[in-house]
A protein has these predicted regions:
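Intrinsic disorder/low-complexity detector
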Residues: 1-46, 96-157, 161, 210-253
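Sparse, context-dependent recognition of short Cys/His-centered cofactor- or disulfide-binding micro-motifs
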Residues: 2, 58, 80-82, 114-117, ...
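Short, low-complexity cationic-aromatic patches
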Residues: 6-11, 61-72, 86-89, 123-126, ...
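Ordered hydrophobic segments in well-structured contexts
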Residues: 14-18, 72-74, 90-96, 131-133, ...
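Short, well-ordered alpha-helical segments
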Residues: 33-76, 148-191
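Short flexible/disordered coil segments
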Residues: 57, 77-83, 134-146, 172, ...
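Short, conserved loop-to-beta-strand elements that form functional interface hotspots
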Residues: 72-83, 187-197, 219, 224, ...
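Short acidic, glycine/proline-enriched helix-loop-strand junctions
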Residues: 78-103, 196-217
Length: 253
């Protein structure tokens, strides 16, 4: 299903590619950040290192595509994984390196849109330019944590937490908008936002979207996608060996 939509949009698959980065906040920045968790607001040191490392994964998947002569990586999926027992995290990006003759040959565009979403954009003359990533790390602060803890005993909004997440969201979105302006994009589409707890009163707000640009004469091959393209996939492999003993094979049937 996905392959049909991708090829019909003009993207011929070449190779499955990935880019990853394992990262740690580090001792020095950790000490600086630890003191700042006593106050409320963004911890710039943490935001900077998270933004830098996550862009490294994007840079590496782009380089993999260049090696095989592709000018696009489509359908990128991003996953953040813990490296068990090490205190580290890994950011992994997986996608399909492809060639689109309608796009410049000397650059590699990236997109985390589904093939169906990309087909729709292609149909109205827009091509993906680049995945945009914006990260903000915020601290609720010692005073805010105590206030929120007390308010958790009663129902209702925790204003301190609401305002903090709102501010972090605005900051992360501002980062991707600034990057979109820098590359001359016309729009940013498919924006997804995530909030994570990092411990020690810290939260990370992550925004991911795709910058797109109008391309003259660009369109999809078919007038519309056939219904089969939207058929749901089935999982044909299940591994429960690591989690269960005596698993009932008839469960769920």
């Amino acid at each position: 299903q996905d392959l049909f939509a991708q090829v019909d949009a003009g993207y011929e698959p070449v190779k499955f590619v990935f880019g990853n980065v394992a990262y740690s906040i580090g001792i020095t920045r950790g000490i600086i950040g630890a003191f700042k968790t006593l106050g409320r607001g963004e911890i710039k040191e943490f935001s900077d290192i998270f933004n830098k490392t996550r862009h490294l994964a994007l840079e590496r998947i782009t380089n993999e595509a260049k090696k095989v002569g592709a000018n696009a990586v489509v359908g990128i999926e991003t996953t953040i994984l813990p490296v068990i027992g090490s205190g580290l995290q890994e950011m992994l990006m997986l996608g399909t390196a492809s060639i689109n003759p309608a796009l410049p040959k000397d650059t590699v565009t990236t997109s985390d849109l589904t093939p169906q979403e990309m087909w729709n954009l292609n149909k109205i003359g827009y091509a993906p330019e680049k995945i945009l990533i914006g990260t903000s790390v915020y601290s609720l602060g010692l005073v805010g944590s105590i206030t929120s803890a007390l308010k958790s005993f009663v129902k209702g909004e925790i204003t301190e937490l609401s305002s903090l997440i709102y501010e972090a969201r605005e900051n992360a979105l501002a980062i991707i908008n600034k990057e979109a302006d820098a590359i001359g994009a016309d729009e940013v589409v498919g924006v997804k936002t995530y909030v994570y707890q990092l411990g020690s009163g810290l939260i990370e707000f992550l925004a991911i979207g795709t910058a797109v640009k109008k391309v003259q004469g660009l369109t999809s091959k078919s007038e519309q996608l056939p219904p089969q393209v939207f058929t749901q996939d089935w999982d044909t492999f299940v591994n429960t060996a690591e989690f269960n003993v005596g698993f009932d094979l008839n469960q769920g049937l």
